[in-house]
Amino acid sequence: MSGLYFEQFFVGQSFNHPWSRTVTEMDNVMYCALTMNVAPIHLDEHYMAGTPFGQRIVAGLYTVGLMIGQSINDTTLGTTVANLAMSDMQFPNPVFHGDTIRTRTKVVSVRESKSRPDAGLVEFEHTGINQHDVVVATCRRTALMQRQPKPA
């Protein structure tokens, strides 16, 4: 377990996660198949050739999932009780096959849980950045995090 406990998070804390991933055509096609997303914007090369993008765009929720996956090892792995909310998803620039995505995370709020004395709420802002240092996605995630165990 390498995640942090509730007490170890503070507002303004930031993480530049060391992992990156080059998104492949197979990633996008499999994600679309698994989620039954048949939008031509993600799957139809000929259709997209006639658009301003000129090529298929990777599904935005795949990118969000990738960002959260890249963030958990040094933030919430093994210490998350539950993810409670995802909000404010934005996709200011497209992700294309072959783009390499890395993630930066900032803690935007930390608060006590009113119903769970053994846990607290942490809100994260995740930012996905491509190989050209261009922001491709942002989202907020609220997680219910374990408190540190009391010494025996």
Predicted regions and their residues:
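Hot-dog-fold acyl-thioester-processing enzymes
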Residues: 1-85, 150-152
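HotDog/MaoC-like acyl-thioester-processing domains
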Residues: 1-11, 91, 95-100, 104-152
